[in-house]
Amino acid sequence: MAANDAELHDSFSGKSQPGENRKASRSSKHCSRSRSRSTERKRKSGDKRHKRSHSRSKEARKKDSEKALKCQSGSEERLEFSDKGRDRLSEDTEERHRRKDKKTSRPRSHSRSRSKEKRHHNRNWDKRRSRSRSRSRDKKRRARSRSNSRSKHRHRSRSRSKSREKKKRIEKSRKKSRSPSISPVTFRGRNTAMDAQEALARRLERAKKLQEQKEKDMLEKWQHQEKAAASTPQCDPAAAAPSPALNVAALLASGTQVTPQIAMAAQMAALQAKTLAETGIAVPSYYNPSAVNPMKFAEQEKKRKMLWQGKKEGDNKSQTAELWEKLNFGNKDQNVKFRKLMGIKGEEEAASSAAVNEDGLKTLQQQEEMFRNLDVQYEMARSQTHTQRGMGLGFSSSFSSRGMDAV
C-alpha cells in the first residue's frame, strides 16, 4: 500500500509541474489579475504536492475492494484510518468548490476535466468502501444476534427442563406422603424373583411329602384289612365275592376317607371273585386288576386250550370233509392238484371208490357237470373281453378240444 501511494504521489507531482507552467503562462497573458492571487495559487499548489492524493487507478481500487471484502472483521485501527481518509476527502472537496467559484471567469481547460474525473473516481471509491463496511457490520450484527439467540434459547430450555424435573420430584414426594399404606422396604442386595421361586419350590416339596405320607397310611390300612379277611374261614369262592364290599363298608364305618381309587379297586376285586366262581379261571397277579376285564380274560383262555389241545381218537369226520375228499373232476391230474390245494392227504383211489355209496356217486357226477359248464362259460367270457389271453380255470386241457356243445 505504501509503495503504491508513493508511486501515485510521484505521478501526480510530475503532472502538477506542467500544470503550474501553464498557469504561469496564463497569468502572463492576463495582466489584469493581481499578484496576490498568483501567490495564493502557488501556496495551494505547494500544499497539494505534500498532500496525499486519494485518486487512484482502477486496478488499485479493485485490489482495495477485494481486500475490504476479504477482511470483513477488520480491526479498530483500520476503521480509524478510514475515518481520517474521509475527513481529508471532505476537506479536498471543499477546497475544490472554492476554486470553482474563483475560476468562473477563466476559460475552460483540460485540467478541469481531469479534476472532474478524479472527483468522480473518488466518489465511486468512497461509495464502495462505505458499502463494504456496512455489509461487514451487518454480518457481524447478524452473527452476534444469532449466537445470542441460540445461547438464550439453550439456557431457557435447560432451565425449563430443570424446573420440570424439580416439579416431578416434588409431586412424587407428595404422593408418597399422602399414601396411607407404607410400602415394604426392598433389599437391593437380594433378588426378589429368586426368593419367590425358592419359596414355591419349598411349598411343592412339603405338599409332596404330605401326599406320600397319606398314601402310605392308606396302604397300611388296606393290608391290615386284607389280612383280617384272609384269616376268617371262607366256605366257598362265591361267598368271597362280597368281601371287598365289606372292606369298603368297614372303611366307611371307621371314618377314614375313601378315595375313588380305593372304590374302583374294591369293585374290580369283587368282579374277579365272581368270574373265578363261574369259570374257574383266575386273573394272574402280574396283570393290573383295574386294566383287565376278568370275564374276557377267561374266554380267551378257553379258546387257547381248545386250539392247542391234541386230536381225540374216535372223532368222526364231518360230511363236508368227506365230500371234498371224494370230489372227482374226471381227470387224475386235476384231482391231485385240487387235493394239494385244499390240504387233503392223498389216499388210494381204489379204497375211496369202494367205500363210495350210490348217493355219493350221483353227487359226484352232478359236481363234474357243473364244473365243466362253469369252465366253458368262463372261457367264453374271457375270450370276448380279454382277447383270449387266458383260457379257463386251469382244470380243462384246452378250449378247442371240448367244443361248444356242452353249453
From Swiss-Prot:
Region spans: Disordered: 1-239
Superkingdom classification of source: Eukaryota
Keywords assigned: Coiled coil
Coiled coil stretches, renumbered: 191-221
Basic residues bias spans: 24-55, 97-178
Sequence ranges of Basic and acidic residues compositional bias: 1-12, 56-96, 200-227
InterPro entries named in the record: SMAP_dom
Family per similarity comment: Belongs to the RSRC2 family.
Name used for this protein in its record: Arginine/serine-rich coiled-coil protein 2
Organism: Danio rerio
Gene behind the chain: rsrc2
